[in-house]
C-alpha cells in the first residue's frame, strides 16, 4: 500500500514538473559545464567540450533505473557514492522504479539531483533480465550514422589566394565529422569516428589517411562476471582524477555536487578531440563488492621535436594539421600506458587503488618558460593513487592521494555535511606538489595542470522550501612556485534561484575573482560579474528567458566595465515535430571585462563564447524529427560588430564587421 501511494504521489509530482519546469538537456549541461568553459585556459575549454559530448551521449542512451548497476550510475558525474547507494537501496526495498517522480522520495537526493537525473535515466516496467544469445546481440541492435558540419561563411585570411594562386590552408573551411555506432541494449556496441578540422584537406598522402582523425571502438559488457571490455579508443577515470582524469571537467561551480566517488569509470571514446584518450584494450571484472580494471594503450601524439629528433619539447593538443608545418608535428612521439585499478565496496566504505605507468619513445624535455618554472625531463613515469569514500546519512568524507615515481605527491580531500535535507556544506582541501607529474590527470583546481597548487574550497547549498535555493562557494588558492600568470587568489560565487510561480523563475548570480598576477606588473587583478536572469514559460511548449550581465575589471591603473543583454526563446509546436531556439544579444565590453554565456547548439557542438568589443550576436537553432529514424538540427549564428571593420587576426582574420557560422547535425537510425 505504501508503495502504491508513493507511485501515485510521484506520478502527480512528475506530471507537474514536466508541464511547468521545462527541464531540458541544454539547461542541465549549461549548469554543469559553463563555469569550466569560462576558464582562461585552452585545456579547460577542451575538457568542457569533451564533457558536453559525454553528457549528450548519456542522455541519448538513458540508464534504466531498474537495471542500472553501481558502476553505470557512477558514470553520471553529479552522483556521489552515497546518492548511488540510496538509489539502489530504494530499488531493493520497493522492487523497481515505475516513475522518475519516485526519486523525490529519496532524501539523499536534492531538487537539483532529481532535475539532472530526469535527463539521463528512465523508469517504468522492469525489462527482461535474461541474457540474450550472441546471435541476437549481433543482429537485433540499432545502427546509427551521424554527420556534423560546421563552417564560417565569410572568407578568412588563410583561405585567400595570394598573387601566385596559393592558399595557406590546403583544405576547405568546413569541419566535418562522421560517426557510426551499432548497439544492442547495454550488452554490445561498436563504432567509429572520422573527422577533419577547418582547413585540413581530405585525401591520402604524407601522414594523411582520408579524414585527418580516425577512431574506433568495440565494447562488450554485462556478460557474466565481465563488467566491461573495450577494444580500440577509450577513457578511464579514477577517484578524483589525480592520475586518471577521464577527460571530464565540470569546473568549481559543481564541485560540491560533483563526483565523490572512489570508483572507476571506463567508457568508449567517441569524441573528435585528438588527445584525451587511450588506444588499446581495457577490461573490468567484478565479484560482488570487489572489482578489478586493467588497461594497456599505445598512442601516437603530436609534438614539437628537437633538432636531432631525439626528444620533444611541446605537446600539441589542438589536432590541427592544415599546413605542412603543422603536419610535421603529427604523431611525433609514441606514448605507452598501462595500469591496474582495484576497488572494493563494504557497506558505507569504498576504497580504491590505482597504479599507472607511462613511457615515451623519446625524451620529453619541456621548454622552461620562467626561471622558476616547474619543469622536468622525463622518458617514463609511474604513479600510484589511493582513493577513499566513507558516508553516513549526515556526513561524507572522501578524497584521493597520489604519488609519482619521484615521490612528489598530490592530494585532495573533502568533508561534506548534510545536517538535514535542505542544507549541504562542503569543505575541500587540495595540495598538488610543484613537481608532481601525471599525464592525463584532471582534477579540481585553478589550473588545468595538476601540479604547483594549494587551495581550500568552501561551498554550500540551502533549499528554503520549494521556492528558494541558495548556493555558492569560495575557493582560496596559491601557487608555491611563481608562474607567468597567477601566484595566488580567491574565487567566489553566490547564487540565488527563486521560483515565484510554476511558470516564472528568477536567478541572481554574483562572481568575483581576485588574483595576484606577476605580469606585466605584480598587482591584484579583480574581476566581478553580476547576472540577472528571468525565465517565463507562458505555455507548456514555450520558454522565454531574459538575461542581463555586468562586468567590472581592475588591474593597476586599468579599470574596464562591460555589459551583456540577451533574450532567449524556445518553442516546441504541438502539431509538428519541430524545436526552435533563438537568441538576440547586445554587448559592449573591453577584452579584459569580457563575459561568457552558454548557447544552444546542435548535438556534439559546444558553445560558450566570450562577448567583448561592441556589437550584437544572434542565433537560430532548428531541430526536427522525421519519423522515428531521422533527426536533423541546424544552427545559424552571427557576430555583428559596431566598432571595427576587421575581426580576429592572423589566419582567422576576416575583413569586415560580420562573422557568420552554420552548424548542421544529421542522424539516421537503422
Indicate where each model-derived feature is located:
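Exposed, low-structure sequence patches enriched in small/polar residues
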Residues: 169-173, 276, 331-366, 375-670
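Small-residue hinge/turn detector
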Residues: 80-84, 110-111
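Extended, structured, electrostatic nucleic-acid-contact surfaces
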Residues: 56-77, 93, 99-105, 118-122
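Outer membrane beta-barrel
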Residues: 208-302, 417-439, 576-592
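Bacterial Sec-dependent N-terminal signal peptides
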Residues: 1-22, 670
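Transmembrane beta-strand segments of Gram-negative outer membrane beta-barrel proteins
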Residues: 63, 133-164, 182, 186-192, ...
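N-terminal, intrinsically disordered low-complexity tails/presequences enriched in Lys/Ser/Pro
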Residues: 19-63, 126-140
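Outer-membrane beta-barrel proteins
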Residues: 195-213, 267-274, 328-331, 402-404, ...
Amino acid at each position: 500500500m505504501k508503495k502504491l501511494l508513493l507511485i501515485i504521489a510521484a506520478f502527480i509530482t512528475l506530471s507537474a514538473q514536466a508541464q511547468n519546469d521545462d527541464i531540458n538537456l541544454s539547461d542541465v549541461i549549461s549548469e554543469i559545464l559553463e563555469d569550466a568553459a569560462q576558464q582562461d585556459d585552452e585545456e579547460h575549454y577542451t575538457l568542457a567540450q569533451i564533457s558536453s559530448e559525454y553528457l549528450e551521449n548519456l542522455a541519448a542512451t538513458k540508464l534504466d533505473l531498474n537495471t542500472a548497476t553501481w558502476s553505470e550510475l557512477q558514470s553520471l558525474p553529479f552522483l556521489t557514492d552515497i546518492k548511488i547507494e540510496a538509489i539502489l537501496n530504494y530499488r531493493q526495498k520497493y522492487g523497481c522504479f515505475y516513475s522518475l517522480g519516485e526519486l523525490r522520495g529519496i532524501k539523499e537526493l536534492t531538487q537539483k539531483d532529481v532535475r539532472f537525473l530526469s535527463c539521463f535515466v528512465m523508469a517504468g516496467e522492469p525489462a527482461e533480465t535474461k541474457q540474450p544469445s550472441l546471435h541476437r546481440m549481433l543482429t537485433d541492435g540499432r545502427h546509427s550514422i551521424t554527420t556534423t558540419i560546421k563552417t564560417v561563411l565569410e572568407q578568412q585570411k588563410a583561405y585567400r589566394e595570394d598573387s601566385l594562386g596559393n592558399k595557406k590552408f590546403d583544405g576547405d573551411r568546413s569541419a566535418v565529422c562522421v560517426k557510426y555506432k551499432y548497439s544492442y541494449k547495454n550488452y554490445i556496441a561498436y563504432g567509429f569516428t572520422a573527422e577533419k578540422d577547418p582547413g585540413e584537406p581530405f585525401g591520402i598522402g604524407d601522414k594523411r589517411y582520408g579524414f585527418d582523425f580516425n577512431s574506433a571502438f568495440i565494447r562488450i559488457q554485462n556478460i557474466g562476471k565481465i563488467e566491461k571490455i573495450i577494444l580500440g579508443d577509450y577513457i578511464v577515470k579514477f577517484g578524483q582524477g589525480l592520475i586518471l582524469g577521464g577527460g571530464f571537467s565540470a569546473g568549481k561551480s559543481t564541485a560540491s555536487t560533483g563526483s565523490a566517488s572512489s570508483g572507476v569509470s571506463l567508457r568508449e571514446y567517441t569524441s573528435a578531440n585528438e588527445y584525451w584518450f587511450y588506444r588499446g584494450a581495457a577490461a573490468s571484472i567484478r565479484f560482488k563488492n570487489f572489482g578489478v580494471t586493467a588497461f594497456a594503450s599505445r598512442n601516437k601524439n603530436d609534438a614539437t621535436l628537437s633538432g636531432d629528433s631525439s626528444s620533444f619539447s611541446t605537446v600539441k593538443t589542438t589536432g590541427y594539421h592544415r599546413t605542412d608545418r603543422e603536419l610535421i608535428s603529427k604523431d611525433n612521439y609514441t606514448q605507452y600506458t598501462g595500469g591496474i585499478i582495484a576497488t572494493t565496496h563494504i557497506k558505507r566504505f569504498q576504497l580504491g587503488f590505482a597504479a599507472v605507468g607511462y613511457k615515451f619513445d623519446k625524451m620529453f624535455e619541456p621548454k622552461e618558460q620562467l626561471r622558476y618554472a616547474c619543469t622536468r625531463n622525463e622518458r617514463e613515469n609511474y604513479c600510484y593513487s589511493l582513493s577513499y569514500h566513507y558516508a553516513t546519512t549526515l556526513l561524507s568524507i572522501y578524497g584521493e592521494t597520489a604519488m609519482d615515481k619521484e615521490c612528489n605527491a598530490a592530494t585532495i580531500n573533502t568533508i561534506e555535511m548534510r545536517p538535514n535535507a535542505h542544507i549541504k556544506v562542503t569543505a575541500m582541501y587540495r595540495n598538488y606538489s610543484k613537481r608532481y607529474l601525471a599525464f592525463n590527470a584532471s582534477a579540481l583546481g585553478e589550473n588545468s595542470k595538476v601540479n604547483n597548487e594549494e587551495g581550500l574550497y568552501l561551498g554550500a547549498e540551502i533549499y528554503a522550501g520549494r521556492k528558494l535555493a541558495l548556493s555558492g562557494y569560495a575557493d582560496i588558492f596559491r601557487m608555491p612556485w611563481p608562474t607567468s600568470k597567477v601566484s595566488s587568489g580567491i574565487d567566489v560565487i553566490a547564487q540565488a534561484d527563486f521560483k515565484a510561480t510554476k511558470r516564472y523563475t528568477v536567478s541572481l548570480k554574483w562572481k568575483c575573482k581576485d588574483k595576484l598576477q606577476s605580469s606585466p606588473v605584480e598587482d591584484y587583478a579583480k574581476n566581478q560579474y553580476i547576472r540577472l536572469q528571468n525565465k517565463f514559460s507562458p505555455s507548456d511548449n514555450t520558454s522565454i528567458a531574459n538575461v542581463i550581465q555586468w562586468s567590472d575589471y581592475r588591474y593597476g591603473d586599468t579599470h574596464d566595465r562591460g555589459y551583456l543583454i540577451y533574450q532567449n526563446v524556445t518553442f516546441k509546436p504541438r502539431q509538428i515535430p519541430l524545436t526552435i531556439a533563438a537568441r538576440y544579444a547586445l554587448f559592449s565590453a573591453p577584452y579584459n571585462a569580457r563575459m561568457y554565456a552558454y548557447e544552444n547548439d546542435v548535438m556534439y557542438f559546444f558553445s560558450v563564447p566570450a562577448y567583448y568589443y561592441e556589437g550584437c550576436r544572434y542565433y537560430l537553432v532548428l531541430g526536427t524529427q522525421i519519423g522515428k529514424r531521422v533527426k536533423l538540427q541546424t544552427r545559424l549564428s552571427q557576430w555583428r560588430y559596431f566598432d571595427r571593420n576587421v575581426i580576429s587576426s592572423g589566419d582567422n582574420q576576416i575583413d569586415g564587421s560580420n562573422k557568420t557560422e552554420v552548424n548542421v547535425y544529421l542522424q539516421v537510425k537503422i
